[in-house]
Amino acid sequence: MSAAPSHIRPATRGDLPEVVDLLNACDIAEIGEPDTTADDVESDWAMEGFELAHDAWVAVGDDEGLVGYSYTGDQFRTGELEADLWMHPEHQEPDLATRLLSRAERRSRELAAERSYEAPMLDIFCIGVNRAKRELLLRHGYVLSRTVYRMTADLSDGVTALPAPEGIAIRPFRVGVDEHVMHDTMSEAFEDHFRQSEEPFDAWKARLLGHADFDPDLWFLAWDRDEAAGALIAYGHGDLGWVKGLGVRRPWRRRGLGGAMLASTFAALAARGRLLVELGVDAEGETQPLRTYERAGMHVTFTYELYAKPLAG
């Protein structure tokens, strides 16, 4: 692709197909296959408080095609903002990544000032194999703060049976009944998570239940009589299943409940012909979820690094 300086402008909804194509080109270069859908990008654009005209940018090459994309957001409202950037792997323009990063940092500082955060930070993920992005972030003052694993389970040979603890019943989510219970259970279960925030219920409901791949039979609640002990949210897309969140409330931890809920989800996905299941997990999580996922037959396929930078000053 051309090395001529690219024009950076605010993203529009009309850019969605090209943004998806760009991100999939990056996916292929990094992991060998496309891994981004329009729903994934639209989910970013639908985060609480996100304004597309101010919070996302595209870089347009001299052939009018998109060669870069970046965004910033503040969905957690904890003072830890997030951003990311992509460049087409065939596009050679040394300073484009820096220009895209600068847009995201500038907007993040504006958002932090508007919300009066005392010590705002900006977080950016980098897949372990992307050395150029890692070096870019390090040059601009970011430091490694966390490691996250992408894990995969192949269900072709069946689902590992992991029974629920005695007295616990795992049941599918009931639309119109369980929304508040699911929201509250997930919020409490993830209160120790390093990026935990209290997402307002209405925003949470619109984002997750409004997802194009929402299927209530892939969401589960674990019940101890009439009290929710844990929750799991999963989606299916094509032949792939994705576990978006699995949480167990503190009194019910260390009893195998997480694995049992995962097995229920695997069985539901396999029944729909989705034999490959993936999820992301914090490698340093206090609840040691990695062991739960390994017992359920999952293994690490990719490593992602989270880099952080103070926004003050």
Outline where the language-model segments fall:
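A short, internal acetyl-CoA/4′-phosphopantetheine-binding micro-motif in the GNAT/acyltransferase core
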Residues: 60, 73, 84-96, 246-254, ...
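C-terminal "cap" of GNAT-fold acetyltransferases
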Residues: 150-169, 275-287, 296-313
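Acyl-donor-binding surface of acyltransferase catalytic domains
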Residues: 73-167, 305-309
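A conserved beta-strand-loop-helix scaffold within acyl/acetyltransferase catalytic domains
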Residues: 30-50, 70-78, 193-248
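Conserved acetyl-CoA-binding loop-helix of GNAT-fold acetyltransferases
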Residues: 93-110, 248, 254-271, 276, ...
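Conserved hydrophobic beta-strand within the GNAT/NAT acetyltransferase core sheet
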Residues: 83, 122-124, 243, 277-281
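Conserved active-site tyrosine of GNAT-family acetyltransferases
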Residues: 133, 137, 293, 298
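Short amphipathic alpha-helix that is part of the acyltransferase structural core
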Residues: 1-44, 163-199
